[in-house]
């Protein structure tokens, strides 16, 4: 199940954007973050897919959600401009960004291709 992140959680679990200039992931396994808003239609369509995949990969990938209305500083620091924005984060290396709704098969293909699962 996806975990909602506050600014405090994000800084501890993902990236300390306030103090680090270069990307430095703080997690110990891959992560996927859904940047969404409750009023966003495509975000609502993505939500059940995101939850389903979070259960399927719960033993290997951390799934997080960030409400862009509540956590505007995080969204701004990451450069979120459109919703939904999905951040695929490997343990080492730079994250991959996907903007817009993803069908379940396309979402899972990115997981398999990017993370090698």
Swiss-Prot record:
Entries under Gene3D superfamilies matching the protein: Glutaredoxin
UniProt-listed CDD domains: TRX_family
GO cellular component: cytosol
Disulphide bridges: 40-43
One of the record's GO molecular function terms: protein-disulfide reductase activity
Keywords: Disulfide bond, Electron transport, Redox-active center, Transport
InterPro entries: Thioredoxin (IPR005746), Thioredoxin-like_sf (IPR036249), Thioredoxin_CS (IPR017937), Thioredoxin_domain (IPR013766)
Described function: Participates in various redox reactions through the reversible oxidation of its active center dithiol to a disulfide and catalyzes dithiol-disulfide exchange reactions.
Name under which the protein is recorded: Thioredoxin
Native source species: Borreliella burgdorferi (strain ATCC 35210 / DSM 4680 / CIP 102532 / B31)
């Amino acid at each position: 199940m996806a975990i909602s992140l506050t600014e405090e959680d994000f800084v501890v679990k993902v990236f300390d954007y306030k103090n680090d200039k270069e990307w430095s992931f703080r997690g110990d396994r891959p992560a996927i973050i859904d940047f969404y808003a409750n009023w966003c239609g495509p975000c609502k369509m993505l939500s059940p897919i995101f939850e389903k995949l979070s259960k399927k990969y719960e033993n290997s990938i951390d799934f997080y959600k960030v409400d862009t209305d509540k956590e505007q500083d995080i969204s701004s620091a990451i450069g979120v401009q459109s919703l939904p924005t999905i951040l695929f984060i490997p343990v080492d290396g730079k994250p991959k960004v996907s903007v817009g709704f993803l069908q379940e098969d396309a979402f899972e293909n990115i997981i398999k291709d990017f993370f090698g699962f």
